[in-house]
Design a protein with these regions (language model features):
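Short, structured beta-strand/loop micro-motifs enriched in basic residues and often containing a Trp
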Residues: 37-48, 93-103
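Short, solvent-exposed secondary-structure boundary/capping segments
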Residues: 75-86
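Short, conserved secondary-structure segments in the cores of folded domains
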Residues: 49, 55, 75, 105-107
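Conserved "cap/hinge" positions at secondary-structure junctions
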Residues: 62-63, 121
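Short, conserved beta-turn/loop elements at beta-strand boundaries and strand-helix junctions
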Residues: 64-65, 71-77
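Short, well-ordered loop/turn sites that connect or cap secondary structure elements
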Residues: 51-54, 59-60, 111
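N-terminal disorder-to-order initiation segments that are Gly/Lys/Arg-biased
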Residues: 1-40, 115-116, 121
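Helix-rich interaction surfaces within compact, conserved domain-sized segments
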Residues: 17, 28, 91-121
Length: 121
């Protein structure tokens, strides 16, 4: 597999961990996250995507591996332009929302400042 994206978490909003616990999802946003969303986001340092995100690819968060099960229609565009995607740990095979990346997870990710997020296709 080829690495197509890597970012580090710069800041964790006060409600971000609660989104994982309560909604089984996390929100990534580049440094320009709108203030009203920032409290729910993991701010990341990179928006450079060098390939296509595909079903069957892999998401790695601090070496925790999650198979990609569905890719929303605007995931790549939002990641490139805003550093923004929602990652849902529900294993859905059909994208529920255009900006959501779905992954299979026995348990949701645990991440914090300095965590490394990678995508492979």
């Amino acid at each position: 597999m080829t690495k197509i994206f890597e970012a580090r978490v710069l800041k964790v909003g006060p409600e971000a961990a609660g989104m994982i616990k309560d909604a089984n999802m996390l929100i990534l946003f580049g440094e320009e996250a709108p203030e009203d969303l920032a409290e729910y986001c993991y701010k990341i340092d990179n928006k450079k995507l060098s390939g296509t995100i595909t079903k069957g690819g892999r998401l790695l968060i601090d070496n925790q591996e999650f198979p990609i099960t569905a890719v929303g229609a605007v995931v790549e565009k939002n990641l490139k332009n805003l550093g923004h995607i929602t990652i849902s740990f529900d294993g859905s095979n059909e994208g529920s929302l255009p900006g959501t990346l779905h992954v299979q997870a026995a348990k949701p990710a645990v991440l914090g400042i300095g965590s490394v997020i990678q995508l492979f296709s």
